[in-house]
Amino acid sequence: MNEEDWNWCNDINYNSIINFSRSFLPHLMKEEETALINTSSIFGIITTPNNTVYHASKFAVRGFTESLAKEMEGSNTQIHCVYPGHIGTNIAVNAKFGDQVVKGESKEGILGLNGEPVKDIKGNQVSEKEAGIRFRDAGMDPDKAAKIILKGIKKNKKRIFVGIDAKLMEISQRIFPDSYWRMTVSYTHLRAHETGYN
């Protein structure tokens, strides 16, 4: 990954969280009862290959937010960190794919890390846009995710995991820290089949 893409990912995922928190926290502390909610990712708990900068940025959000939560204990402001699993948003449709994620795009569709075309289970080559749409449609409804987050805030949960996939991956990482990756791969293959990929 080139330096521009590295900095872009960190600016979006991590530096924006710091800037937002630093800007709004003083105002929140003046109110009677408030909450600051930062979004990390399940990829701030587990790791996968070929996503180094994304993991680094999401782990950084986790560290920043959980440390801030400890500093703010006893104050009028609750600090929460959200760890979403697969949510049905347009993030994959609008994603900026660096050379770490896909090798490129041919006229027929995207090329995977091995340089081979990405195909669905029927053998049809898939465009980058179509891959993003399928990913979105297979995820949890965003309204349901929002309700889970609000419920977590009301219960004053410092860590809010959204989706059964996020909960399972977090548990597997804690119980099997050296081998959880095999479970993650199995789950990923299952989800890929459900969304129409080999």
Regions found by a protein language model. Give the residues of each.
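Active-site loop immediately N-terminal to the catalytic Tyr-X3-Lys motif
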Residues: 46-53
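Residue(s) in the substrate-gating loop at a strand-loop-helix junction
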Residues: 41
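Active-site helix of classical SDR
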Residues: 21, 57
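SDR active-site lid
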Residues: 74-160, 164
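Conserved small/polar residues in nucleotide/adenosyl-binding loops
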Residues: 188-195
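Substrate-binding pocket helix/loop in short-chain dehydrogenase/reductase
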Residues: 2-7
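Active-site-adjacent segment of SDR/Rossmann-fold oxidoreductases
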Residues: 46, 67-77
